[in-house]
A protein has these predicted regions:
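Non-ligating segments of multi-cofactor redox enzymes
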Residues: 1-2, 6-316
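Long, low-complexity, intrinsically disordered cytosolic termini of multi-pass membrane proteins
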Residues: 319-320
């Protein structure tokens, strides 16, 4: 029989255990077989002294590989923060503000959307709620750096200014609708708006959709995700229209309607907007839209200027 190799004097003495059963010879384990090193694993002399090697979380490598995306996103959010903080000064220069806003929509659509694939979704909200209820783990949300940073920024701005920051500036599909509307105005396409009575009733649709999706998510997030295709985001942003024809037809129809009815989908069908409006009602600051005694009566400037009809005739903000 061959004797086992003696351990090197430079290494601490330790026992070796067989990690794999050696092959049988005529149904018998040969006693004289010398086990190859790859079939052996170290066993600690004292129980509980061996610890597995440290493995770096996967999300760290992903963040390191996407440094460029992270830097460009942070710069964009810094520019938007400047706009929000100095909005009174920018409002005195409407032409410059309009150009800045249009340029930011291009950035949102092409970089945040089609390049970074950072289109937020109602499924993100439902997944977060489910995670809180069943056991929250940061690793599940850190895996995509752009989504994580964007959601963090949106959470802060929701409390400060409401959901208008995301819906009006950072939503890639919303930016696409704004750019489509801009092209439609230059082509002098007709505008179509519903009456106030019809508008107020249609607004309720997105809340009904949100409630239904939330109920489904309690049973199965997979089922909720399939019905969340009411959002055209996956078709337009994530897959760039490379899908089955009925998904593409639905998305194109919504974009076409947006050319004559500004942000139709956002106003009436978007469950993400409905979800964001709930915490947005508790924003800390009202000074970003100052009220005066003339607001609503007789002045109707804000109500007429706001093309998404977020200002009531009374001059109050319509959080819906």
């Amino acid at each position: 029989t061959h004797s086992a190799a003696k351990p090197s004097s430079a290494e601490p003495t330790r026992r070796l255990a067989v990690s794999q059963t050696p092959p049988l010879v005529h149904g018998v384990v040969p006693l004289s077989r010398e086990m190859p090193p790859q079939n052996l694993m170290p066993v600690p002399d004292k129980p509980g002294t061996w610890t597995p090697p440290y493995e770096e979380p996967a999300w760290i490598a992903i963040w390191q590989n996407r440094k460029f995306d992270i830097v460009v996103l942070v710069i964009g959010l810094a520019v938007l923060s400047f706009v929000l903080i100095f909005q009174d000064w920018l409002a005195r220069h409407p032409t410059a503000l309009t150009r800045l806003r249009n340029g930011f929509h291009v950035y949102t659509l092409f970089f945040i959307g089609w390049w970074g694939l950072a289109q937020l979704s109602v499924i993100n909200v439902l997944t977060f709620v489910g995670s809180v209820m069943q056991g929250f783990r940061w690793e599940n949300f850190l895996i995509d750096p752009m989504l994580f940073i964007l959601w963090g920024f949106v959470a802060v701005t929701l409390l400060l200014w409401g959901r208008g920051v995301y819906c009006g500036w950072l939503c890639p599909f919303g930016a696409l609708q704004e750019l489509i509307l801009l092209a439609a105005r230059r082509l002098k396409l007709p505008e179509m708006e519903f009456s106030d009575a019809v508008h107020e009733r249609l607004v309720a649709l997105k809340y009904i959709i949100l409630i239904l999706l939330f109920g489904l998510s309690l049973q199965s997030i997979v089922d909720a995700a399939s019905y969340a295709e009411v959002e055209p985001f996956k078709t337009v942003i994530s897959m760039r229209f490379q899908r089955e024809w009925h998904y593409v037809a639905y998305a194109v129809a919504l974009i076409g309607i947006a050319a004559i009815n500004r942000k139709f989908y956002c106003k009436y069908l978007c469950p993400l907007g409905a979800a964001l409006s709930i915490p947005g009602r508790f924003r800390l600051f009202e000074w970003w839209l100052r009220r005066r005694k003339e607001c609503g009566k007789p002045c109707q400037v804000c109500a007429h200027q706001c093309s998404v009809r977020a200002i009531r005739p009374t001059g109050e903000i319509n959080a819906n």
